Regions:
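Cytosolic regulatory regions of ion transport systems
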Residues: 1-228
Length: 228
């Protein structure tokens, strides 16, 4: 009854009453956005949101721009393509690709935060030096590597919710790894990746326990901290 009264007051004032609802699961959040809210009483502004998606956008999308500096692009966080990828276009409109650089995002922990970062990266990691006219093996793709000890089970659940991801994206290579970031072989791979001059490597630690996340982030192979 009290909510109805508030709605009535809002209708009298001809203002919408904002109603913000946090959806913890990204799949539920995606589904609710597709629903049509009943319009019998159009005095409510329904705004669903997801904490993890909001933070993913603050890190890497346009939401990452620092609003304190309106004169230029000033992100709060380094973009995934921290060396801008460019192409050259001649007067005839033909383009040539000089940059062989590519983004490689490694997400450790396929938690809610890890999944949100993954989905946001899929939205934004499309770069100018991908050329679909080249043979498949010569195309420069973004790589996203997802690492979790329980990946086999989690991947099945995730791909059930998002069944068409890989079939709709040609310029991103997705690697699901059922592995432990502390595994010596995995650490050797991280070291190798960090020394690749064309690979723009970003590692996001997203395990559910904050203390473990901090420990993992501070104890990666030394070469990762030494590089750009």
């Amino acid at each position: 009854k009290r909510i109805n009264n508030l709605r009535g007051l809002r209708s009298i004032e001809e203002h919408l009453m904002p109603v913000y609802v946090q959806f913890d699961r990204i799949s539920s959040y995606s589904s609710i956005q597709k629903l049509n809210i009943a319009k019998e009483m159009p005095n409510i502004y329904f705004r669903p949101f997801n904490f993890h998606e909001n933070w993913a956008r603050k890190l890497w999308s346009l939401y990452a721009i620092n609003n304190n500096n309106d004169s230029e692009y000033s992100p709060n966080y380094e973009p995934l393509d921290y060396r801008p990828i460019q192409i050259n276009i001649n007067k005839e409109g033909e383009h040539t690709v000089e940059s062989q650089d590519f983004v490689h995002l490694v997400i450790v922990g396929f938690s809610k935060m890890g999944r949100a970062l993954f989905l946001e990266a899929l939205r934004i990691c499309h770069y100018a030096n991908y050329d679909d006219s080249l043979p498949t093996e010569k195309r420069i793709r973004t790589i996203i590597t997802l690492i979790d000890k329980d990946m086999e089970r989690m991947k099945n659940y995730f791909t059930t919710q998002f069944p068409h991801l890989e079939s709709q994206i040609d310029d991103i290579k997705i690697e699901y790894r059922a592995d432990d970031i502390c595994n010596p072989q995995m650490r050797e791979e991280l070291t190798k990746w960090s020394k690749d001059k064309n690979r723009m490597l970003t590692i996001a630690i997203c395990v559910s326990d904050p203390d473990i996340s901090l420990s993992l982030g501070l104890n990666l192979p030394a070469s990762i901290y030494e590089n750009e």
